[in-house]
Amino acid sequence: MAEQNTIERIPYVEFADNANERTPCVLVLDCSGSMRGEPIKQLNAGLAALEKELKDDIDASSRVQLLIVKAFGKDEVKIESDWIDAMNFTAPTMEAGGLTPLGKAMETALQKIDEQKCLYDSCGVTSKRPWIFLISDGEPTDYGWEDSAELCRYAQKNKKVVIHAIGTQGANLEKLAKFSILPPKRLTGLKFTEFFLWLSRSVSCISKAAPNANKYLDDITEWNEK
């Protein structure tokens, strides 16, 4: 069993078995102390819904790759779930506590994307432009986060990545907006499940270059606060 698990983690074997074009998607999640209680519970429910929705989509399950970056603790950043095809993704159970080092978390996301792009190239696997979803109920607490935000905007302007900043109730949208050239959105209440279902359908359409992709991208009424 140990040998089998080791083989499953070797990316070259993974790409040999599945050479489909990939759509990389990174979730940068604020798991600071203010997310304790119902917010973190609903976030975990949303991640579980994302797992099921992607696995139920035969095409997306083999084309979408996920990575989760957790911002928490004493300005700590953790790769909660490393790059994995959606078909093999298991939603982690997130726990809340500590501060909100969003700058460090977003830089980590950019670095992991660069590394994965190099891996795709070395394996002869094509890929769509990566997506990053930054989700927070507050604002950055780490020193130098403005520099990290500038790196994010630069990467997006140069078409290396698409970044969406999503704020829940209480989030400082003015500061979250600095991480993207796109306007930030605010989640209605704790509608994490509705948001992640939208995300799943959107990345699925993008991964398949579906003609109705823009329809799903633009229709955010189920979770976006007007």
Where are the predicted features?
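Von Willebrand factor A/integrin I-like adhesion domains
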Residues: 165, 169-226
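An active-site-proximal "capping" alpha-helix that borders the catalytic cofactor pocket
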Residues: 43-55
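Von Willebrand factor
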Residues: 77, 89-128, 162-175, 190-198
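DG-centered beta-turn motif at the end of beta-strands
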Residues: 29-32, 43, 109, 125-142
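VWA/integrin I-like adhesion module and closely mimicked acidic/polar interface patches used
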Residues: 138-179
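Short beta-strand-loop
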Residues: 63-93, 173-179
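Acidic, polar low-complexity linker/tail segments
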Residues: 1-26, 31-41, 55, 115-125
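Extended hydrophobic secondary-structure segments that form protein cores and membrane-embedded regions
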Residues: 25-28, 65-72, 129-137, 164-167
